[in-house]
Amino acid sequence: MAVILKHLAIILLVFVIEIKMGQGSQIERRSSGVTHEMLSSISKPEKRFAFEDTVANERSPQITFSTDWGQRKRSVNEDREAAERERSPQMKRSEHEEQLMAKDEMKRFQEERNPSSDDKIAIDKRSPRYLPTII
């Protein structure tokens, strides 16, 4: 089973790489399965990738390759920080407030499940139609 999943993952990876490189039309003409040509194209990426500022591609001409991973990581962190600053005050609850809310929900749930003795009818939340059950 693991071998089959491994082969399927390799096939999927090859198809994704082929589509990303703009050779999706060639995939349709090939028979299914991993060929030697496909595996050799994966093992030699220097022939397939052009590390330039802009790669001319008929599908999306604005693809850029950057080798400065530090800059990319900084921009991702800046985006996350900006998103944190833009969050509404309701979403910025502290962990303590969230724990209190969870405790309140648990109390309400327990009260619904175990009503007091003076209640004659309780709603059974497990039933899909919320049919009242007599205690």
From Swiss-Prot:
First and last residue of the signal peptide: 1-24
Gene Ontology CC: extracellular region
Tissue: Expressed by the venom gland.
GO molecular function: toxin activity
Localization terms from the record: Secreted
Keyword terms of this UniProt record: Secreted, Signal, Toxin
Segments of skewed composition (Basic and acidic residues): 75-127
Chain residue ranges for the region called Disordered: 61-135
Family membership noted in the UniProt record: Belongs to the scoloptoxin-22 family.
The name this protein goes by in its record: U-scoloptoxin(22)-Er1a
Organism: Ethmostigmus rubripes (Giant centipede)
